[in-house]
Curated annotation (Swiss-Prot):
Pfam families: Inositol_P (PF00459). It comes from Emericella nidulans (strain FGSC A4 / ATCC 38163 / CBS 112.46 / NRRL 194 / M139) (Aspergillus nidulans). GO terms for biological process: inositol metabolic process; phosphatidylinositol phosphate biosynthetic process; quinate metabolic process; signal transduction. PANTHER family: INOSITOL MONOPHOSPHATASE, PROTEIN QUTG. The keyword Oxidoreductase does not apply. Gene3D superfamilies: 3.40.190.80, Fructose-1,6-Bisphosphatase, subunit A, domain 1 (3.30.540.10). Keywords: Magnesium, Metal-binding, Quinate metabolism. The gene is qutG. Mg(2+) 2 binds at D100, D103, D251. Substrate binds at E78, L102, D103, G104, T105, D251. InterPro entries: IMPase (IPR033942), Inositol_monoP_metal-BS (IPR020583), Inositol_monophosphatase-like (IPR000760), Inositol_monophosphatase_CS (IPR020550). This is Protein qutG. Not known. Probably involved in quinate metabolism. One of its GO terms (molecular function) is metal ion binding. Mg(2+) 1 binds at E78, D100, L102.
Length: 330
């Protein structure tokens, strides 16, 4: 990707973003540790779509810092965006910060450690910087274009890289860890989103060759309760496959930046008409994502070929999901 911002300036923005993520994470940690009073939260769309005062306070901290340091940059945050209720894709060619102040709010309200702050920096629709900080785990995932992806700024991602990054299994999705989320749409209706997801989960988990040939027999199915953390763990190499629909750009911008810089692949969750055709990179605002961990070569394939083979095998087993963006409001 040719970035119009010089590398030296990108490096400065990256250092600022990592420092800001740590400060925001410290505020999250202070709030989650304050368990003397009951957590106060409001429901957005339903009982599993929550927002706390902490979400808004952390976003305010991040937004103020960014607008002070980089007043010419655009800012898109989950909570300020949600209040507008436009649901339009607002990212353009301009340098844009895309922020989720607290991804995994349900986890946060239960003091389950899989929650984080997510800060992405986007230029020409491409995430060039990503920082994810999970304060209860003290895990900082970060990347800058052309600088690699890192855990706690010391260990390069993916973590397993000696003697080389392992290829994906020849029988993938068998022998893989598959991550997915239940999502906010819990309507129990025939062929609804929940039913399609469950069918896809079972297809991936069932013994090989079962379910009309769709059984994938993955090693395990994981649901971390945070799409951002799913992506971070895919970049780390701990998750092999992440499949999801319903996310917004602030959920994935930082994670996609980190995964791509680590050598991963991100494409659309829904299979195209011709699954043997070229695999296109995902559109940031598509709301449908399939991510594959970084992979090295096998004796017969390049790392990219093992990733693309895995993508096609997932597509053969999952249902189409419908998460179109709402129409423009007048």
């Amino acid at each position: 990707m040719d970035c119009p911002i010089p590398q030296t300036e990108l490096d400065e923005i990256y250092a600022f973003a990592t420092d800001l993520a740590r400060k925001a994470g410290q505020l999250l940690l202070e709030r989650v540790n304050d368990r003397n009073s009951e957590q106060v939260y409001a429901e957005k769309e339903n009982a599993v779509d929550l927002v706390t005062q902490t979400d808004e306070d952390v976003e305010s901290l991040i937004k103020t810092a960014i607008q002070t340091k980089y007043p010419a940059h655009k800012f898109l945050g989950e909570e300020s965006y949600a209040k507008g209720q436009s649901r339009e894709y607002l990212i353009d060619e301009q340098p844009t910060w895309c922020v989720d102040p607290l991804d995994g709010t349900v986890n946060f309200t239960h003091a389950f450690p899989m929650f984080c702050v997510s800060i992405g920096f986007i230029v020409n629709h491409y995430p060039v910087i990503g920082v994810i900080y999970a304060p209860m785990l003290n895990q900082l995932f970060s990347s800058c274009l052309n600088r690699g992806a890192w855990l706690n700024e010391m260990q390069q991602l993916p973590l397993i890289r000696k003697p080389s990054i392992p290829p994906l299994p020849a029988t993938a999705p068998s022998k893989c860890i598959f991550a997915c989320e239940w999502g906010k749409d819990r309507r129990d209706i025939p062929d609804g989103t929940l039913q399609r997801k469950i069918e896809s989960f079972v297809n991936m988990a069932a013994e090989r060759g079962s379910r009309g040939g769709k059984g994938g027999m993955v090693h395990g199915v994981r649901s971390l309760g945070s799409a951002t953390m799913d992506l971070a763990y895919t970049a780390m190499g701990s998750v092999d496959i992440w499949w999801e629909g319903g996310c917004w750009e602030w959920d994935v911008a930082a994670g996609i930046a980190i995964l791509l810089e680590a050598g991963g692949l991100v494409t659309a969750a829904n299979p195209p008409e011709d699954i043997e055709g070229p695999i296109e990179p995902v559109k940031l605002g598509s709301r449908l994502y399939l991510a594959i961990r970084p992979a090295g070569p096998s004796e017969t394939e390049t790392g990219r070929e093992t990733q693309e083979r895995t993508v096609r095998e997932v597509w053969r087993r999952v249902r189409q999901l419908d998460y179109e963006r709402p129409t423009r409001q007048s």
